[in-house]
Amino acid sequence: ADGTADKPIVFTANSTTPTSGYWGGIIINGKAPISGSNANKSDTGLTEIDNNYKYGGNVDNDNSGSLTYVKICYAGARSTADIEHNGLTLNGVGNGTKIENIYILESADDAVEFFGGTVNVTNLLAVNPDDDMFDFTQGYSGKLKNYYGVWESGYTSTEADPRGIEADGNLDGDYSDHLRQSDFAVENMTIVNNAANTTDNVDRMQDVIKIRRGAKATITNALVKGSGGTIDLIDMNDSKDAGNA
């Protein structure tokens, strides 16, 4: 799916009055490595939305095609009471895949979540996601450049612990002994929180940056600003395992 700056491809709700969570989202499954116990990188995972679909493998440069100049708007619908889509979900996607110039508006869960994989993503804008702006787990090891996340003035999240970045080394922090914990790099990142500056769970970020459960992140040239509230700017502690940034 390749648009242009003048004519981006738009995935959105079929409604004149769309709201977040109106439809599912975009999910890409690849064959790149994820965290696991096998030294030969043969571990696979099952998608959150439908466990009939696998992802992961040992192909670092796996190619899932290209996604450029794309808008994803009002995604994040729930498939069950406990499972909801992200705007963009990248499961074990390899670095042979091209993902650039992506705009995600008002996803009902995370704007984008990486489940392992090695894919590199450039130029990503996330506006008013209900949960995390950028979420990483299960051994993600790619490079990210030019990331911009914003909560606009007057926006209200309904999640208990929304974050700018949330990073786990392994899936749900339950596998601290796994090989290939998340270890990724972010260059040029801006997080703007202009939501209400209060202390309750629906009007502030839990953490701007949360690196935990064995994850490691190298963040270069980052700017955090805004009038909104947060409990922690950077937090690397967790009851299951700490992180490293």
Residue ranges and their predicted role:
Residues D2-G3, P8-D109, E113-D130, D135-A245:
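Extracellular beta-rich repeat passengers
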